[in-house]
A protein has these predicted regions:
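Substrate-recognition element of Asp-dependent hydrolases with the DxDx(T/V) motif
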Residues: 89, 94-113, 118-149, 158-164
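Active-site neighborhood of HAD-like aspartate-dependent phosphohydrolases
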Residues: 2-52
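A metal-dependent, Asp-based hydrolase signature
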Residues: 56-106
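An amphipathic alpha-helix signature
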Residues: 28-37, 72, 76, 80, ...
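Short, surface-exposed acidic
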Residues: 40-55, 84-100, 154, 180, ...
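Asp-based, Mg2+/Mn2+-dependent phosphohydrolase catalytic module
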Residues: 1-10, 119, 123, 138-247
Length: 247
């Protein structure tokens, strides 16, 4: 049995939001499945359509950022690229667009579903540590999800950023470090489900990290975990509730 470390009180814990605190990507996956079925492409297989959509999403991120608005744009753009030209009659194409917008609207209307143990764990951790929410995406979308989650009172600050890279992590810890002059970078921890956005860049910025595995993590966030720099820590967990035994 692997012995978990015991971390002293007084840490600053930065929490990711989507697929760390609440379900998120599973709803996008449902929309993608519906999109592929709606497209019913006669040349590309469903797997090939999905790969084309992934390519479009990678492009769209650079111009539209992350979030539902960007995703909707990607669906429509992918539809335009893969639709036969000309596609007749026109009203059929318009109907497809309406269906695609409906897939996105279903995500927007989805109730927030907290992951198991999240509320209770945050409540306990907040008595021993400083908790900060650090999520990327559209500011209005993420702020709305936080408000609907009922978790806002557990966080002393909220950081909604355009991208999570080492420079952003350094900026965030620098801003909050000024509030506690004695707090070192190694007393900051990033906790999340994404190796690409939560773990690797946080380690590169000098933080410790906790990788919280989620089986539905967005494919564009998939990558191998980087080696842990000397003097830093990386903890891997399969359950949010296990945090209380460590922190």
């Amino acid at each position: 049995m692997v012995r978990m470390p015991q971390i002293a009180p007084g840490q600053t814990l930065l929490f990711d939001a989507d697929d760390t605190l609440w379900e998120n990507n599973v709803y996008f996956e449902r929309a993608i499945a519906a999109f592929i079925s709606c497209l019913d492409h006669h040349e590309y297989t469903p797997a090939e359509v999905r790969e084309r959509l992934n390519e479009v999403e990678r492009e769209t991120i650079h111009t539209h950022g992350y979030g539902l608005h960007s995703f909707t744009h990607s669906l429509l753009l992918c539809f335009e690229r893969l639709s036969p030209a000309p596609m007749a009659p026109t009203h059929m194409k318009d109907e497809k667009r309406r269906q695609i917008l409906g897939f996105a609207r279903a995500i927007a209307e989805q109730e927030i579903e907290l992951l198991p143990g999240v509320a209770e764990t945050l409540a306990e951790l907040s008595t021993r540590h400083r908790l900060i929410l650090m999520t990327k995406g559209n500011h209005a979308e993420q702020a709305d999800k936080l408000a609907r989650s009922g978790l806002g009172s557990y966080f002393s600050a909220v950081e909604i950023v355009a991208e999570k890279d080492p420079a952003t992590y350094r900026e965030v810890i620098g801003r909050h470090n000024s509030e506690l002059a004695s707090c070192a970078a190694l007393e900051f921890w990033m906790l999340g489900n994404s190796p690409r956005s939560d773990i690797n860049p946080a380690l590169a910025a000098g933080l410790n990290a906790v990788f919280l595995f989620h089986k539905h993590t967005w494919v564009l966030e998939h990558t191998a975990l980087d080696p842990v720099p000397v003097g830093q820590q990386l903890i891997e967990l399969d359950s949010f509730a296990k945090l209380c035994a460590i922190f």
